[in-house]
Amino acid sequence: MRPILLSGHERSLNQIKFNRDGDLLFSVAKDKIVCAWWSANGERLGTYNGHQGAIWTVDVSPNTVLLATGSADNTVRLWNVKTGECIKVWDFPTAVKRVEFTPDGSRLLAVTEKRMGFLGTIAVLDINYEDLEAQAEEPSLRITCTESKATVAGWSYLAKYIIAGHEDGSVSQYDSKTGEQLENVQAHEFDNLISDIQFSADRTYFITASKDKSAKLISSRNLAILKTYVADTPLNSAAITPKKEYVILGGGQAAMDVTTTSARQGKFEARFYHKVFEDEIGRVRGHFGPLNTVAVHPNGTAYASGGEDGYVRVHHFDKPYFDFMYEVEREQLRK
C-alpha cells in the first residue's frame, strides 16, 4: 500500500475531508489556505485563499457545490468549490473549531470557541442553493454550552439531532429544531477532551476520539456506548470504514511531549481496529509527528491522514485489505 504524499501546506494539518463522491479531498492547516486535491492521484486542483488565521475545520456540501471553512480569524467562510471564490463570510466573536453540513446540505453547523468572556456555542446557518450569493446573515439557531464547551459536533441521521463532543469528555444530543439538550453521557474519562467525531454512512452511529487514549462507537439515537477501542497514545481523530468492519484511529504524543525523534517512539501511526471485535489488526506508519486527522473514502477504497508534519498521505487499499477476515466471518460466509 504505497501512499501518495500531498505536500501543499507549510504548517500542521487540522482537518481533511473527502466529498461524497470521493473524487476530491480537501485539506486545511494552520497556514490560512484550503487545498483541493484529486484523491485518485494526489494532483492539486487549487487553493481557496481569504482566511486571515489558522483554519481549524472544513466541510464540503453533499452535492460538491459549496465548501465551508472555520478559522481562528473568527469567521466561517462559504466557497464556491468550482470557481474558488468566497461567497459569504459569517463573523463570530471567537474562533470556529468545527463546521459540518447536514446530510442534505440545507444547513451548516459551526462550533465556536469559549474565550474572552464568550461562552462556547453551536450555531446553525441555513444554506441557500437557489441563489448562492443570497445567504442568511444570522444563524437560525444558537445552542450555548453553559457547562463544558463543545469541541466537535455533527448531524445525526436525517439531521434530527446535533451530536456534540465536549471538553470534559462528555457527548451531548440536542434537538436540531429547538436546540434543547436531550441527552448527555460521560463517554470518556472526565476532563479528557473529545478531539474528533465522525459518523457512519447512515449516521445512525458515530465514533469519538479522545485524549484519554480511547475511541468509542456510540449510537446516535440514545448515546449508548456500543464499542470501545483502547490505544496507547492520545487520539486526535477516528473514522469508520465502509465496506469492511474496521475503524481507523490516528494520534500520537503531542509534539511538545515528544522527547526522542524516533517515529516509533512517539507512536505516530494510523491504527486499524476491528469494528466489532475491538482488536487492533494493523498499523500504517509514515508520518513524522502526530496524526491530527484521518478520513476515509466514502466507498471504503482508500483513506487519508493529515499530520503535524504538514503532509497529507493518501493510501489506496490493496486486495489483502479486502480479503482479510476473521475465522468467524469466514464461517458466516460459508453458511
UniProtKB/Swiss-Prot annotation:
UniProt xrefs under PANTHER family: EUKARYOTIC TRANSLATION INITIATION FACTOR 3 SUBUNIT I
SUPFAM superfamilies recorded: WD40 repeat-like
GO CC, any one term: nuclear periphery
Keywords: Cytoplasm, Initiation factor, Protein biosynthesis, Repeat, WD repeat
One Pfam short name: EIF3I
Record-level GO BP terms: formation of cytoplasmic translation initiation complex
First and last residues of every WD repeat: 8-47, 50-91, 145-184, 189-228, 286-325
Gene3D superfamilies listed in its UniProt record: YVTN repeat-like/Quinoprotein amine dehydrogenase (2.130.10.10)
UniProt keyword Endoplasmic reticulum, yes or no: no
SMART domains: WD40
Subcellular localization(s) per the UniProt record: Cytoplasm
Species: Aspergillus oryzae (strain ATCC 42149 / RIB 40) (Yellow koji mold)
Function comment: Component of the eukaryotic translation initiation factor 3 (eIF-3) complex, which is involved in protein synthesis of a specialized repertoire of mRNAs and, together with other initiation factors, stimulates binding of mRNA and methionyl-tRNAi to the 40S ribosome. The eIF-3 complex specifically targets and initiates translation of a subset of mRNAs involved in cell proliferation.
GO molecular function: RNA binding; translation initiation factor activity
Keyword Acetylation: no
Family the UniProt entry places it in: Belongs to the eIF-3 subunit I family.
Protein name: Eukaryotic translation initiation factor 3 subunit I
Assembly and oligomerization: Component of the eukaryotic translation initiation factor 3 (eIF-3) complex.
